[in-house]
UniProtKB/Swiss-Prot annotation:
One of its GO terms (biological process) is arginyl-tRNA aminoacylation. This is Arginine--tRNA ligase. InterPro entries: aa-tRNA-synth_I_CS (IPR001412), Arg-tRNA-ligase (IPR001278), Arg-tRNA-synth_N (IPR005148), Arg-tRNA-synth_N_sf (IPR036695), ArgRS_core (IPR035684), DALR_anticod-bd (IPR008909), Rossmann-like_a/b/a_fold (IPR014729), tRNAsynth_Ia_anticodon-bd (IPR009080). Its main location: cytoplasm. It comes from Clostridium kluyveri (strain ATCC 8527 / DSM 555 / NBRC 12016 / NCIMB 10680 / K1).
Length: 566
């Protein structure tokens, strides 16, 4: 039951306008005393040739519905006050009926959506910057799937490119075999950083790197063997992190997967008369779009990642026939994706507009931007383990007798990190602050998880007070705090759809924060176990149960596990 739609349907009986148009105009008033929904009459003034205030008064007098306890006009607005009992009963019954699927829908109708995310570079550490893409992508995947789409998760590994020529050159010159066996990623990072340091003094090293990559592209056995070694060592390390995060993928087809598909793409671009030569390189001119040329082949004949992304997009359309293809990649790649998507459009790919770049900001520690070339890297596995350790210290301090402390610390600590990445608009930079991130107060992961655990604790205490959920008296949940909580719980599906439409997972994060805040306001304002009478107690326990279900579902969509006891 959609109460906003019910208000729109009531208005439509009296005004000759499309239902969707009316529904689109309906707002949520800024204050509860102004109603639950408000319909502005400004747009009707020209048609009806009357002042909006008069229209709202005349319209209000014609509106009657059992779903609204009263309908009032206030200036140019018609304000709808839902019937609290009907609204509460419908919402809470719906939550417990659907359980873990509450908030889901069949909006996607099985359409295929591809989400590319995480995509770390082979032979480089999985650092804290990679978790931005991983967290956003995993949350979008879960939310999109939850709304009835068929979603495919792609980890487009950075396993090809001139950096591998540089790494082979560095490996041949400086690699310590013993260190490589002991800690492969750190040793590969060390020699990669050394290469860039030495190349600043001796630029001919860059030429050597290009030469090795050309050999790699030409299929040289020795270079391919080294490249495979780097890849195997890296994937082994990445798996440790993905296991900690409980993140999976349907495909690990990285840049190298498309090496045998690029010639056909370059040929297709050439046949369409789009390819021109510029300083020895092959490019697609995008001047009419005010975009710099898209380089398809460099002057030495090697491809760049634009070529591979063009091949990947075409392959994915052919393989998955996607309705939408989403790329969760840093904001610094915005121009690159504009070039790729515009080139696809010029190639006659009418689906190019279905490709969306979901950019995100930077991760900072002490005002530093992370850079692999300079070695300014904070390894993600270390950060996650540190977060778990710090959380365990807090638990030992606050509740040393807690069962399964290590398991709880793992869920809270890792959840706190993910929550930090998803808390704000994805384009904002993140500055890590341990004290804030692990606080059990304020807008944090531990605060939301604690709210869930508090609710579950209440429910465990009430187990002996069994009751028939079909005999709940919903009129007992009429206080301001109770009804505000119910209204927020009802809004779950809308917040997910809003997050999908805007490709902004933080909308759901802010939503679960709102649920936790409203729940704690209710908890602090009203006694549950010692309520005035048994019917109030049962109704409030029912509300607690529904709140826990919604918090669990919301955290799950963010890739965060709940903790039953804290």
């Amino acid at each position: 039951m959609d109460f906003k739609k019910l208000a729109a349907e009531e208005i439509k009986k009296n005004i000759d306008l499309e239902l969707n148009f009316i529904e689109g105009l309906i707002e949520v008033p800024p204050k509860p005393e102004m109603g639950d929904y408000a319909f502005p009459c400004f747009q009707l003034a020209k048609v009806l040739k009357k002042a909006p205030n008069i229209i709202s008064k005349e319209l209000k007098d014609k509106l009657h519905s059992k779903y609204f306890e009263k309908i009032e006009n206030l200036g140019p607005y018609v304000n709808f006050f839902v019937d609290k009992k009907i609204f509460t009963e419908y919402t809470l019954k719906e939550i417990l009926l659907k359980g873990d699927s509450y908030g889901s829908s069949d909006m996607g109708e099985g359409k295929n959506v591809v989400v590319e995310y995480s995509s770390p570079n082979i032979a480089k550490p999985f650092h804290v910057g990679h978790l931005f893409s991983t967290s956003i992508g995993n949350a979008l995947y879960k939310m999109i799937n939850f709304q009835g789409y068929n979603c495919t998760r792609i980890n487009h590994l950075g396993d090809w490119g001139t950096q591998f020529g540089k790494l082979i050159a560095a490996y041949n010159r400086w690699c310590n075999a013993e260190e490589l066996n002991r800690d492969p990623i750190k040793e590969l990072l060390r020699i990669y950083v050394k290469f860039h340091e030495e190349a600043e003094k001796d630029p001919s090293l860059n030429e050597e790197g290009r030469m090795y990559f050309k050999k790699l592209e030409d299929g040289s056995e020795e270079e391919i063997k080294l490249w495979k070694k780097f890849k195997d060592l890296s994937l082994r390390e990445f798996k440790k992190v993905y296991d900690l995060l409980k993140v999976d993928f349907d495909s690990y087809a990285g840049e190298s997967f498309y090496t045998d598909k690029m010639d056909a793409v370059v040929e297709e671009i050439d046949k369409k008369g789009l390819l021109v030569e510029s300083n020895g390189a092959k490019v697609v001119l995008l001047d009419e779009y005010n975009i710099p040329p898209c380089i398809v082949k460099k002057s030495d004949g090697t491809t760049i990642y634009a070529t591979r992304d063009l091949a990947a997009a075409i392959y994915r359309k052919k393989t998955y026939d996607f309705y939408k293809s989403i790329y969760v990649v840093g904001l610094d790649q915005s121009l690159h994706f504009k070039q790729v998507f515009t080139t696809l459009k010029l190639m006659g790919k009418d689906w190019a507009d279905s490709c969306k770049h979901v950019g995100f900001g930077l991760v900072r520690f002490a005002n530093k931007k992370l850079s692999t070339r300079k070695g300014d890297v904070i390894f993600l596995e270390e950060l996650l383990n540190k977060s778990v350790e710090r959380t365990l210290e807090i638990i030992n301090e606050k509740n040393p007798k807690l069962e399964n402390k290590e398991e709880a610390a793992k869920k809270i600590g890792i959840g706190a990190v993910i929550f930090t990445y998803l808390k704000n608009n994805r384009e904002k930079d993140i500055v890590f602050d341990w004290n804030e991130m692990l606080s059990f107060e304020g807008e944090t992961g531990p605060y939301v998880q604690y709210s869930y655990a508090r609710g579950k604790s209440i429910l465990r205490k009430s187990e002996e007070a069994s009751y028939d959920e079909n005999q709940i008296d919903y009129s007992k949940l009429g206080s301001k705090e109770e009804f505000e909580l119910v209204k927020i719980l009802e809004n779950f599906n809308k917040s997910i759809i809003n997050a999908i439409n805007r490709l902004e997972p933080f909308i759901v994060t802010r939503y679960v924060i709102d649920v936790a805040k409203a729940f704690n306001k209710f908890y602090n304002a009203h006694s549950i176990m010692n309520a005035a009478d048994e019917n109030i107690k049962k109704a409030r326990l029912y509300l607690v149960k529904c709140t826990c279900q919604v918090l669990k579902n919301g955290l799950n969509l963010m890739g965060i596990e709940v903790v039953e006891k804290m």
